[in-house]
């Protein structure tokens, strides 16, 4: 059975989003750019998991999460925030990170729904 997951679209003051590069060995989404996030642990809410995973993967502390309202798998919840502190330092689960604008993002091999989520945040967030 698939576990529930949560991800966070982190947006900076220039409307750039944070993308993380998934390594080739990781399996699903290998070599693609994606938002920070991951699976829920026992007893966690989706928001708690999103906050924890973002900090584990990037060292950023995120707050004031709001839900991205696009159709996604019912096991996935997408959040966004413009409220974060810290400096990005990626963990072992990723090979690189980048802050990208809407014009730049289409030059990247993106995980599913990344572009759709970014557009939704720019229009609604």
Indicate residue ranges for each PLM-predicted region.
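Conserved N-terminal beta-strand and adjoining loop/helix that marks the start
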Residues: 1-18
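Active-site-adjacent beta-strand/loop module that shapes the phosphate/pyrophosphate-binding cleft
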Residues: 3, 12, 62, 69-107, ...
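Conserved Nudix-box catalytic region and its N-terminal flanking loop in Nudix hydrolases
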Residues: 16-52, 56
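A structural microfeature
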Residues: 19, 66-69
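Short secondary-structure junctions
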Residues: 57-63
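Residue-level detector of family-conserved "landmark" positions at structurally sensitive sites
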Residues: 64-67, 115
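Charged phosphate-binding loop/patch that engages nucleotide di/tri-phosphates or the phosphate backbone
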Residues: 115-125
């Amino acid at each position: 059975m698939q576990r529930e997951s949560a991800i966070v679209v982190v947006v900076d003051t220039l409307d750039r989003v944070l993308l993380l590069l998934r390594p080739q060995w990781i399996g699903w989404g290998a070599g693609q750019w994606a938002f920070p996030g991951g699976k829920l642990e026992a007893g966690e809410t989706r928001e708690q998991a999103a906050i924890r995973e973002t900090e584990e993967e990037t060292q950023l502390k995120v707050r004031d999460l709001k839900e991205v309202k696009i159709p996604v798998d019912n096991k996935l919840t997408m959040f966004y925030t413009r409220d974060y502190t810290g400096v990005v330092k990626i963990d072992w689960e990723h090979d690189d990170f980048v802050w990208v604008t809407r014009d730049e993002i289409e030059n990247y091999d993106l995980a599913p729904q990344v572009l759709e989520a970014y557009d939704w945040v720019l229009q609604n967030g």
